[in-house]
């Protein structure tokens, strides 16, 4: 009896087509017009470990300013479509729009190189596990100590037209909350959030939410024990479809472990008995195996500096090749090589005592930072064809709204009520409803706002970064003062008459 059976050969179907993301160079035309823009000296001063609230006669808080915080600058640029251009025939406002492209940047850092310390007066350290003479698991109940460390050394620069994305580990949710008992290890969850100005960086203790995952408040130094340390999510930003969050990045990290300790407290996960052989006396039961090193960033040197030098953007890592959508730029900076903390001392008496008494002096600590930002922007045009506008609308409809393009609503078929006496008290108030204000998409996020709308200049040779740009571009500047050589006039060969020779007879 013959039976039918399906073929063993597998048939592979082609994958479904996906919408193609094009590079900005495919629909953005670059012009030969460049502008320089730069900030004044940017300074910030504060307490390196925590925010000091108002007290006594002080009417303002002292902010937390640490070298281990992200500095995120939100840079506002002028609208090029309302810009005074040198050539009126540069573009057609009916069919084109102008945008800025960032082609050069230099991040200036002031202040000398230095190493700043952080620590905790009640740091959770039990034993020196590198060379411990004995186990102290049966020693005092509180083994915390005053410890200071020098954090991991980090230099970082991320530039894009949207904020950079950070990642950290936070306390997750259990599938069965009713089964969670006090003292159980919480589940972990990877969280992605925008990096804001003032967020703490990874200092060598990991990117995590210490306020919810370390309830002893003594596992890490003071400045991060109740904070969230974020690490840039390079994987997500590199895989960004449109490449807006990271045109390019510069980073340098350095770390080694200086001391090796274990943590005090009850060990939550017991060591399996098959992993060791029991001892006697103080070795009857193992001590805490929850080991934790103290990080160190080691030596700082001017040979490994990423700042105070120009960078030119020729090709971005993503599809956005430096186009500043919404006329703004986000610059994320970290520099721990200038982390010196100032220690200040003042006397509590009217005059400085002649004999030192520590009870007559107060000690304070402060941290200062200094920045100088310079940019080179290139003017670009976009021809508003149907395909380009459709693509931009799919990418970000707010861009077309900024260009005064919008979708016209369909005509209304319903009747509209119109009253005769608008000022009459017999009818409802006829005041027009206020126009809805445009909401900032980054409302509620903290950035260092920098306004460059009135600081653009086309005289590149008048600024340090502009001269460097002209040098690398191979452009020779023309002299503006002093004597100029006149162009040589073309000389025509004069026709000389042949003289007759006298012949002697």
From Swiss-Prot:
Q: Where is the composition biased (Basic residues)?
A: 496-505
KW ATP-binding (keyword) present? no
Region of interest (Disordered), residue spans: 126-146, 480-505
- Subcellular localization: Virion; Host nucleus
| Pfam families in the cross-refs | Late_protein_L1 (PF00500)
Q: Which UniProt keywords apply?
A: Capsid protein, Disulfide bond, Host nucleus, Host-virus interaction, Late protein, T=7 icosahedral capsid protein, Viral attachment to host cell, Viral penetration into host cytoplasm, Virion, Virus endocytosis by host, Virus entry into host cell
GO cellular-component term (any): host cell nucleus
A Gene Ontology biological process noted in the UniProt record is: virion attachment to host cell
Which InterPro entries does the protein's record reference? Answer: Capsid_L1_Papillomavir, Capsid_L1_sf_Papillomavir, dsDNA_vir_gr_I_capsid
Q: Which GO terms describe its molecular function?
A: structural molecule activity
Give the Gene3D superfamilies listed for this entry: Major capsid L1 (late) superfamily, Papillomavirus (2.60.175.20)
**Family membership noted in the UniProt record:** Belongs to the papillomaviridae L1 protein family.
Complexes and interactors = Self-assembles into homopentamers. The capsid has an icosahedral symmetry and consists of 72 capsomers, with each capsomer being a pentamer of L1. Interacts with the minor capsid protein L2; this interaction is necessary for viral genome encapsidation. Interacts with protein E2; this interaction enhances E2-dependent replication and transcription activation.
Q: What does this protein do?
A: Forms an icosahedral capsid with a T=7 symmetry and a 50 nm diameter. The capsid is composed of 72 pentamers linked to each other by disulfide bonds and associated with L2 proteins. Binds to heparan sulfate proteoglycans on cell surface of basal layer keratinocytes to provide initial virion attachment. This binding mediates a conformational change in the virus capsid that facilitates efficient infection. The virion enters the host cell via endocytosis. During virus trafficking, L1 protein dissociates from the viral DNA and the genomic DNA is released to the host nucleus.
- The molecule here is called Major capsid protein L1
Species per Swiss-Prot/TrEMBL record: Human papillomavirus type ME180
UniProt lineage: Viruses, Monodnaviria, Shotokuvirae, Cossaviricota, Papovaviricetes
């Amino acid at each position: 009896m013959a039976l039918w059976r399906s073929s063993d050969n597998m048939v592979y179907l082609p994958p479904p087509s996906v919408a193609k993301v094009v590079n900005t160079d495919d629909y953005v035309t670059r012009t030969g017009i460049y502008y320089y823009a730069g900030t004044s000296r940017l300074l910030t001063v504060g307490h390196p470990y925590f925010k000091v609230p108002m007290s006594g006669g002080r009417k303002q808080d002292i902010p937390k300013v640490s070298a281990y915080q992200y500095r995120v600058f939100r840079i506002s640029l002028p609208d090029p479509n309302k810009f005074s251009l040198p050539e009126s025939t540069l573009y057609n406002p009916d069919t084109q729009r102008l945008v800025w492209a960032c082609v050069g940047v230099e991040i200036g850092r002031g202040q000398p190189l230095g190493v700043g310390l952080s620590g905790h007066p009640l740091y959770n350290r039990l034993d020196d596990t590198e060379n411990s003479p004995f186990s102290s698991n049966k020693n005092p109940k509180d083994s915390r100590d005053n410890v200071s460390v020098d954090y991991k050394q980090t230099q970082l620069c991320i530039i894009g037209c949207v904020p950079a994305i950070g990642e950290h580990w936070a306390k997750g949710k259990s599938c069965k909350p009713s089964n969670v008992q006090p003292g159980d290890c919480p589940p972990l969850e990877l969280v992605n959030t925008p990096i804001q100005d003032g967020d703490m960086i990874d200092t060598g203790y990991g990117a995590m939410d210490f306020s919810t995952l370390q309830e002893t408040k003594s596992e890490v130094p003071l400045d991060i024990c109740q904070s969230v340390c974020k690490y840039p999510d390079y994987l997500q930003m590199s895989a960004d479809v449109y490449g807006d969050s990271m045109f390019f990045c510069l980073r340098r990290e350095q770390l080694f472990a200086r001391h090796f300790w274990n943590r005090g407290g009850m060990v939550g996960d017991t060591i399996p008995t098959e992993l060791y052989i029991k001892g006697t006396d103080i070795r009857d039961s193992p001590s805490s195996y929850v080991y934790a090193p103290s990080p160190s960033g080691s030596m700082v040197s001017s040979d490994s500096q990423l700042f105070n030098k120009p960078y030119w953007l020729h090709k971005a890592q993503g599809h956005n090749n430096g186009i500043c959508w919404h006329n703004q730029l986000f610059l994320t900076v970290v520099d721990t090589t200038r982390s010196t903390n100032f220690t200040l001392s003042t006397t509590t008496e009217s005059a400085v005592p002649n004999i030192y008494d520590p009870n007559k002096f107060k000690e304070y600590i402060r941290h200062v930072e200094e920045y100088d930002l310079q940019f080179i922007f290139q003017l670009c045009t976009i021809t508003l064809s149907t395909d380009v506008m459709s693509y931009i609308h799919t990418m970000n409809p707010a861009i077309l709204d900024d260009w005064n393009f919008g979708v016209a609503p369909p005509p209304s078929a319903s009747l509209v009520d119109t009253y005769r006496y608008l000022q009459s008290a017999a009818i409802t108030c006829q005041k027009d409803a206020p126009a809805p204000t445009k909401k900032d998409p980054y409302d509620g996020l903290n950035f260092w706002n920098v306004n460059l709308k009135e600081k653009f200049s086309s005289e590149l040779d008048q600024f340090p970064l502009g001269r460097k740009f002209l040098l690398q571009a191979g452009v020779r500047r023309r002299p503006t003062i002093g004597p100029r050589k006149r162009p040589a006039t073309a000389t025509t060969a004069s026709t000389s008459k042949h003289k007759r020779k006298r012949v002697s007879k």
